[in-house]
Amino acid sequence: MSRVSGDWAEAYRRKWKWDRVAWSSHNVDCYPSGCPLHAYVKDGKILREEQAGSLPQIEPGIPDMNPMGCQKGASWPQLLDAPDRVTRPLRRVGERGEGKFEPVSWDVALTEIADAMLDAIEEQGPESIIVPMTPEMGASPARIFANALGAVITDGSAEFHDFSPGFHLTWGVFNPVASMDDWFLADLTLIWHANPVYTYITMYHYLAESRYNGGEIVTIAPDFSPSAVHADYHQPIRIGTDAALALAMCKVIIDAGLYQKQFVQEQTDLSLLVRTDTGRFLRGSDVAVGDRDDQFFWWDALTRSLTSAPRGTLATTGVEPALEGSYRVLLADDNAVEVEPVFARLRRELDDYTPEKAGAICEIHPDNIRALARKVATRKTKIFVGCNSGKSYHGDLMERAMALLLALTGNWGKKGTGVRSWAVIGLDGQAFLTQK
């Protein structure tokens, strides 16, 4: 073996000489963020960073979150001394778009900005100042400043559409997700509008480990993405037709009687009664003068009578909410109206979404739609949804169709089910400082 020598060898040796090892992390717009890293320091400068792999196992039988960290974080020390790093204020000279700037002192920059803000406040009020939010977590101090000033803060999620409005509308919560290790427990994972092999580097291992655990992964994507390469199945789809696919799967499940009846009755609004004349929920104020507007009703198949749905619990104890049929109800004005469960209306709405019709829309063979629907209906299913759906026209309806698919199959509220949408982060730290 020949001896390696020269400048290159000496540079390599210097890489393995350091003064101390410190803890480091990067709190930027990736999730869960806060990867524990070791920073190797020499002469007061960071030589490099490495994954610490120091996280404990949270639950027996489930892999830990190690190692955490990616090449983006590993390259961060190079940016500290990069020649194009902006280290002082720059003021534009010339026209917008020319890319011409001149350096100015901090005093000059802060004074000019403050003067402009004061002029705007005096002339038009503080609401004339707009502070755009960014994906950078360092925006938290800017948010605090803007709130104190009375300025307008934009919705960062709306600006770059990394948000799932359909799920928000369905469940009424901003972030309806479990922790990342829950992916490991899914029997079936649908990767939809996402490419986690590239975009979720630190936590993708849970999806790979899920396969080792006996789970199955299906990537639904128009392209043969890196995440499709590592899936059990890749289902190509025509861009923008995801809602049709999800609704066709729902129709297959209902027609085959594969839906989870008790879950649908108890955990969804599909069992509540709707007036056929208005298409609105039957409400307490419809039935009795002075009753609540937020009181809804079931039709009890056991007593064959109208029954108030309890407002303090989802339990259907002693009641068998009907999912089919139409019924006559006497209103407070002594007029009778026809009502039916939401489920009955849903069944009719899905008549237009046969596998054949949806297959023509989505460019998917009908048998593939049927097979995928049966997989979802018979397994603990998690949908790994990326932010691409929020960037699609009617993306909210795509997400609501996905939520309906999970509702019919009882796939939320227990381990290994539900959706992974938007961010999965620890509810602590500067990202949530101004939201507490």
Model-derived features: positions:
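Secondary-structure capping and boundary motifs in well-ordered enzyme cores
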Residues: 216, 223, 241, 350, ...
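A charged, amphipathic alpha-helical module
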Residues: 341, 345-371, 375-378
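A glycine-rich, hydrophobic/aromatic-adjacent loop/helix-cap motif
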Residues: 356, 367, 376-436
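Short acidic (Asp/Glu) and glycine-rich catalytic loops that position anionic groups and cofactors
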Residues: 225-230, 323, 348-354, 379-385
